A protein has these predicted regions:
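Conserved loop-alpha-helix segment in the C-terminal half of the alpha/beta-hydrolase fold
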Residues: 318-342
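N-terminal cap/lid segment of alpha/beta-hydrolase-fold proteins
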Residues: 1-44, 356-357
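Conserved alpha/beta-hydrolase "acid-adjacent" motif
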Residues: 58, 167, 299, 322-329
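Primarily recognizes the serine-hydrolase "nucleophile elbow" in alpha/beta-hydrolase
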Residues: 108-180
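Alpha/beta-hydrolase
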Residues: 188-305
Length: 376
């Protein structure tokens, strides 16, 4: 296969100091890597994109191109830094990528929603079909228009997280008793203290889950109160940063009988306790507005809810040894997709298909065959 082609796409400006780069502020752009098939190809192009991860070297790009499907790994303006990430603005970036591919002459464009990109792809298509996200969660206008969001022809979701807001609600450490102190702990809810034998009792898990939601709701109430205070104070900034400590504490990491699949004990990122206490982790660095858009109960980017509002064909690739998506996750997607959804089980597949070249091949084969059936 030839090398990937670097793609730079102009996008609309975002909020003040969205990037510390003056060059980016003067000319906002996003970047991607396009892998094209040799020869004529199928006339179909795919975009694989995540709200913040760098997907320019995604493992599906070359296999899809080898099967006649051009594939662009596209980064949002927030690549590598989700501190100020607004999901509604990411839609503009993804829409710019779709428009760019259409302008290159591709007859059909599909989205590959991998990992956290699944909720993004679903959010995008739901808004492309019927624009409702006219305002951010905090109430300011998004300035999105239908012209920003050309619809795509199909969605392919793999190792699909249900959305940032759901994920954080299931991963927040409920033992935190002081939001300013990363070490302050209520041992009764410390998953990693070793106080409870595995498998965990059902009532223990229920109390843990309730405490997670209670912490999320406390943070959310503080965010709203702080935002209202700023907006009521002359000369105050429009937003502020804050930290959320310990965001990697799900009983399923330690008890594989919960929502059982083929996963090993632990986190997809290594030792779960280490990730929980790490200086940088999911949802650690935030602003008031970015928290509401990404992580809050009011986020507009809930994957299954958005998927239910779409009409295009959907392929769900379920990795059975994934330590971050579970049978209950797949059930949410299946219910949302209904009869439009086809599920392909990738037996033994871990979240990233790391070290599993045969399963990458299986996934690309399944995607090619499914697209040949549903796109006419």
């Amino acid at each position: 296969m030839p090398d990937a082609r670097l793609v730079a796409i102009d996008v609309q400006p975002g909020v003040t100091m969205e990037s510390q780069s003056g060059l980016q502020a003067l000319r906002p752009r996003i970047f991607g890597a396009l892998m094209q098939p040799q020869g004529e190809g199928t006339g179909t192009a795919a975009i694989v994109m995540h709200p913040t991860s760098n997907f320019m070297g995604h493992y599906l790009m070359e296999p899809l191109a080898a099967r006649g499907i051009a594939c662009m790994g596209l980064n949002s303006r927030y690549a590598g830094n989700d501190t100020m990430l607004l999901m509604e603005t990411v839609l503009q970036d993804l829409g710019a990528g779709v428009k760019w591919l259409r302008a290159q002459g591709y007859k059909r464009v599909v989205l590959v929603g991998n990992s956290g990109g699944a909720a993004l792809a679903s959010f995008y298509q739901s808004q492309a079909e019927q624009l409702t996200a006219t305002h951010f969660v905090d109430g300011l206008p998004t300035h999105l228009s239908a012209a920003d969001l050309p619809p795509v022809d199909a969605l392919m979701l793999s190792a699909a997280h249900p959305g940032r807001s759901r994920l954080l609600a299931e991963w927040l450490d409920p033992s935190v008793i002081d939001e300013t102190d990363p070490l302050a702990t209520d041992p009764a809810f410390d998953l990693y203290a070793g106080n409870d034998p595995v498998p965990f009792a059902a009532d223990r898990v229920a109390r843990f889950r309730a405490a997670q939601l209670a912490r999320r709701d406390r943070i959310e109430a503080w965010v709203w109160a702080r935002l209202r205070m700023l907006r009521a104070t002359p000369g105050a900034p429009s937003d502020q940063t804050f930290l959320v400590y310990r965001t990697h504490s799900d009983p399923r990491f330690l008890d594989t009988t919960l929502d059982a699949n083929d996963r090993p004990v632990g986190s997809i990122w290594g030792d779960a306790r280490t990730v929980n206490y790490a200086a940088n982790a999911m949802g650690r660095f935030n602003t008031l507005r970015s928290w509401l858009s990404q992580w809050s109960s009011g986020s507009q980017a809930d994957g299954p809810a958005c998927l239910a509002r779409t009409s295009v064909p959907v392929l769900l690739m379920t990795h059975t040894a994934d330590g971050s998506t579970f049978p209950s996750t797949a059930a949410l997607w299946r219910e949302a997709g209904g009869a439009r959804l086809t599920e392909e089980r990738v037996i033994g597949g871990n979240h990233y298909l790391a070290g599993q070249a045969a399963l990458v091949t299986q996934s690309a084969d399944a995607m090619q065959a499914w697209l040949a059936r549903v796109l006419h």
